[in-house]
Design a protein with these regions (language model features):
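Extracytoplasmic electrostatic interaction patches
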Residues: 80-144
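A broad, low-amplitude sensor of folded, mature protein cores
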Residues: 1-2, 34-37, 70-75, 110, ...
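Charged/polar, solvent-exposed surface patches and flexible loops
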Residues: 9, 33, 125-129
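Bacterial Sec-dependent N-terminal signal peptides
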Residues: 1-12
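Surface-exposed acidic loop/strand-edge motifs in secreted or periplasmic proteins
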Residues: 10-96
């Protein structure tokens, strides 16, 4: 089962790290910018692909679109973070198979953005074929 953290706690854990080295501080700033900053990105929803920027490093999608991700014509080589939107409470019962992301060579982070209240454990239970190369974190916004 993956270790799922609230996004701010995840970034804080990077900042505190084992020691406050320049590497851990700059890494936490990089991740913070990756999560909250505007980056070249791909939006993949309902089979439609929209790419913004030359070398996208961020992919936005939703639970319903995940099944089509492997066959979609996406620029996968430089994606470092995938933002998955949870729109309804029924989405929380969906499974996210991390094997679908195996073609994303630089992928390190999976960010769950939920419109419904949920827990770290509920999000962790959504994942299949967990691989420790991915850090998984979440945020709840505009919860019903």
């Amino acid at each position: 089962t993956p270790n799922v953290m609230y996004v701010n706690a995840f970034i804080s854990s990077l900042k505190s790290g084992n020691a406050k080295t320049r590497v851990s501080v700059s890494n936490s700033q990089y991740v913070e910018n990756l999560v909250f900053g505007i980056q070249p990105a791909i939006y993949f929803n309902s089979g439609t692909v929209k790419t913004y920027g030359d070398i996208p490093i961020k992919l936005f999608t939703d639970i319903a679109s995940l099944n089509g991700i492997s066959s979609a014509n996406l620029l996968k080589d430089d994606i470092e973070i995938i933002v998955i939107k949870i729109k309804s409470s029924t989405d929380l019962y969906s499974k996210i198979d991390l094997l679908k992301f195996s073609e994303f060579n630089k992928l390190k982070y999976i960010y769950i953005l939920s419109n419904v209240s949920t827990t770290e454990q509920n999000i962790a239970n959504m994942f299949l074929n967990y691989n420790q190369q991915y850090s998984i974190f979440y945020k709840i916004e505009n919860a019903e």
